[in-house]
Amino acid sequence: MVAFGAFDLYAGDIASRQLRYQLLRADRSSIYFGRLLGLCITLVAVLSLLGLVVTVYLGLKLGAYPWGEMLLWALQGTLMMVVVSLPYTALCGWISTAAGGSFTSLTLASLAIGGVPLLASLGSLQFDSAQYVNWLLPWGFQSRLLHHDPLQQGLAIGGCLLQTAVFVWLGHRTFLRRDL
């Protein structure tokens, strides 16, 4: 879902040369971080709405748990979906700044997000250490976001935030040096 929302964060406007008109009124960092922040706010709103709809549906249909527990479960699940989506959003932003067009950006983002676990699983058939390729993206630790141990959750959240920071830095660096 994130790849389809973030793949054209910058690529379409870079390809059509529309960003050069914004450069008269704003600097590159403001454009980069403004668009990224806007996408993150939209992503949080969509995931919150999704969590609310699922919770209300399960609460009305099943009725097996009290509403307080259901809302806490939904809050935790939604928060973890947001946390795991941040690195993918930043990765798509980086790819979008580097790609020459929208379709190229979508293709590269899909290959990166889907290719990492595929490469890890196929590579681990031959080499056991190839499974560590999963750690390039949150694939390696995203299942620990819903772990019962707070330490495991904290480490997974920290890993997602660290990857987000790295991808945002790479995207910003690429955007600053890119010909718009």
PLM features: what roles do these ranges have?
Residues 9-40:
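Helix-loop-helix units of permease transmembrane domains in multi-pass membrane transporters
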Residues 3, 14-16, 152, 168:
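Short, solvent-exposed coil/turn segments
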Residues 106-177:
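Terminal transmembrane helical anchor/hairpin motif
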Residues 1-8, 33-103, 150-153, 158:
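Secretory targeting signals
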Residues 24, 28, 49-50, 67, ...:
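Residue-level signal for alpha-helical context at structural boundaries
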Residues 11-14, 18, 53, 57-66, ...:
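Membrane-interfacial segments
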